[in-house]
Amino acid sequence: MLALWSLLLLWGLATPCQELLETVGTLARIDKDELGKAIQNSLVGEPILQNVLGSVTAVNRGLLGSGGLLGGGGLLGHGGVFGVVEELSGLKIEELTLPKVLLKLLPGFGVQLSLHTKVGMHCSGPLGGLLQLAAEVNVTSRVALAVSSRGTPILILKRCSTLLGHISLFSGLLPTPLFGVVEQMLFKVLPGLLCPVVDSVLGVVNELLGAVLGLVSLGALGSVEFSLATLPLISNQYIELDINPIVKSVAGDIIDFPKSRAPAKVPPKKDHTSQVMVPLYLFNTTFGLLQTNGALDMDITPELVPSDVPLTTTDLAALLPEALGKLPLHQQLLLFLRVREAPTVTLHNKKALVSLPANIHVLFYVPKGTPESLFELNSVMTVRAQLAPSATKLHISLSLERLSVKVASSFTHAFDGSRLEEWLSHVVGAVYAPKLNVALDVGIPLPKVLNINFSNSVLEIVENAVVLTVAS
């Protein structure tokens, strides 16, 4: 508890900067509209909240229905808080309308939450007959944003009060003095009735906030665990989470790829939008894992190459007749492509480029014979990355942009390796690039942010990062 209060105290100093932000981790900016929608959805009782609110089997169930928190045997039902009122006056709660949610972010503290609802009641009137009443109620609460013992963002109810509004009489006769009696009873019981509702709603939202931090699988490569790097920040428009991605191997060991020294420059967030920023580090880490696992290496054989791609000694000799003119003709070629170093990703000027340094060993062989080495090349392949977001990850599709080669060693005469660049580009584009795209199907994982769907987000490549923006 002491640690939690210490965090709350520090929070008063933590408010986000409105200028161009520089960061090296994953960044999530949650617009206040999204937080408001999460609270509203918890009241409606969406299927995702069934474990918290109970089974949702009909329109009138859920949080407000007969089987929910407030209806039936709940707070509004038989035996609930209003049982006391019923014993005193025969007053019974008949209906509670879906509250209207009003939300205000409090920089350096948390949230001011208001729920405006209408309570429908009936009772036996003092003059006989049935009285039907309705009272407007505003529930106002101050909610602190803190960090739980698990290291997740958490909303904590600090203060709650109710304000009784207009009371309407729909049927029956009620003397004016009894209006005051009803008002006094409601004033006493409503805080005990509706403030626990706020606490329950916050519990639902806290589960969604807690999902921001968790383990995301990278398939055979390992996983990424997201954790808070710093205290969350609060402005009057959004909550900002600075998230540290921790990469782990399949065995669970932490893989510490060097982070870029150049921070990402993220533009200011527009109103009524939420953002996730994917840092350069995650791109370099993904390609680094692929390289260390050998997923970027390939043996290119004639069986893998389309018929329109030349891959024989005859084709090669035509390109370099002075160096390779004496080779036996019509023999098939083998290309052993090995990426010896981690690729380098560049995110700059609305483009995503990947540089792959590779050694290409070219051999020829007679069917059923032993392959014979011709030469080795040191190459740098520059591929362009097309990025597409989905709900859970950022998909990457590669296409070759350019290729440069130098001769590392030759078992024939010396030659200028640049004369093979066009031919190799044809081979790599036809065979190697599709293989890379299969390996990259794992994508770049996105943290879960209040169940916000980023599949239709606007994607922007900025300096050393990719920013996904979705309208609230």
Curated annotation (Swiss-Prot):
Matches recorded under PANTHER family: BPI FOLD-CONTAINING FAMILY B MEMBER 3, BPI FOLD-CONTAINING FAMILY B MEMBER 4-RELATED
Signal peptide start-end: 1-16
Keywords: Cytoplasm, Disulfide bond, Glycoprotein, Secreted, Signal
Gene Ontology CC: one annotated term: cytoplasm
Organism: Homo sapiens
Function: May have the capacity to recognize and bind specific classes of odorants. May act as a carrier molecule, transporting odorants across the mucus layer to access receptor sites. May serve as a primary defense mechanism by recognizing and removing potentially harmful odorants or pathogenic microorganisms from the mucosa or clearing excess odorant from mucus to enable new odorant stimuli to be received.
Record's keyword annotation contains Disulfide bond: yes
Protein name, entry field: BPI fold-containing family B member 3
Subcellular localization, as worded in the UniProt entry: Secreted; Cytoplasm
Pfam families in the record: LBP_BPI_CETP, LBP_BPI_CETP_C
Gene3D superfamilies from the UniProt entry: Bactericidal permeability-increasing protein, domain 1, Bactericidal permeability-increasing protein, domain 2
SUPFAM superfamilies reported in the protein's UniProt record: Bactericidal permeability-increasing protein, BPI
Family note: Belongs to the BPI/LBP/Plunc superfamily. BPI/LBP family.
GO biological process: innate immune response
Tissue: Detected in nasal septal epithelium.
One GO MF term: lipid binding
UniProt gene name: BPIFB3
Residues modified by glycosylation: 138, 284, 453
